[in-house]
Regions:
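Generic alpha-helical structural context detector
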Residues: 24-28, 88, 126, 147
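A glycine-rich dinucleotide-binding beta-alpha-beta segment and adjacent secondary-structure elements
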Residues: 76-129
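A generic structural signal for secondary-structure junctions
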Residues: 28-31, 95, 101, 151
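Flexible, small-/acidic-enriched active-site or ligand-binding loops
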Residues: 42, 107-154
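Aromatic-enriched alpha-helical interface/lid elements that frame and gate functional surfaces
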Residues: 1-77, 81
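Residue-level detector of short coil/turn "hinge" positions at structural boundaries
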Residues: 34, 81, 103, 153-154
Length: 154
């Protein structure tokens, strides 16, 4: 703990602390080593018990800089974290481009007849993934889902 999204001075990041050592590094890197040295927060169990206080302190510190700063600083010390991207940021990501992970799917409602989707990151040499079903429109399957899950029909 913590394993969640945090606001920064500009865009959000996700932090995924997996052990007490990573928590100490997180606190040191954000300039708040006293959080980790508090006996109530020294262990994961203690942090879970005092979640609201821990999260409030971390949020306040992380709001002092932007996401690029924190992702670089925390990554440099081994604290798992990453940016929370918008869809346009996902499609512009250098790794997404390098791995050719953008798939243009035909879509009747799209302005140019196609909508970009993110490809499966797992690649099989003998059984490549096939993309056959276009993404649904908002509420396109709502009636079927309500009927299947709740037995209701509008």
């Amino acid at each position: 703990m913590p394993y969640q999204v945090f606001p920064t001075a500009d865009d959000p990041i996700i932090v995924a602390v997996g052990n007490d050592s990573q928590f100490r590094k997180l606190c040191e890197t954000i300039g708040r080593p006293e959080i980790a040295s508090n006996p109530n927060y020294a262990t994961n169990a203690g942090r879970v018990q005092h979640r609201q206080q821990v999260i409030a302190a971390l949020e306040a510190a992380l709001r002092t800089e932007g996401r690029h700063h924190w992702v670089a600083a925390l990554g440099a010390v081994g604290v798992p974290c990453g940016p929370v991207n918008t869809l346009s940021q996902v499609f512009e990501d250098p790794q997404v481009k390098h791995r050719e992970m953008v798939v243009a799917m035909p879509h009747a409602k799209a302005a140019d007849g196609f909508v970009n989707v993110l490809a499966n990151p797992i690649r099989f040499s003998e059984t490549p993934v096939q993309y056959r079903i276009t993404p649904p429109m908002r509420n396109e399957h709502a009636q079927e889902i309500l009927h299947d899950w709740l037995g209701k029909r509008n």
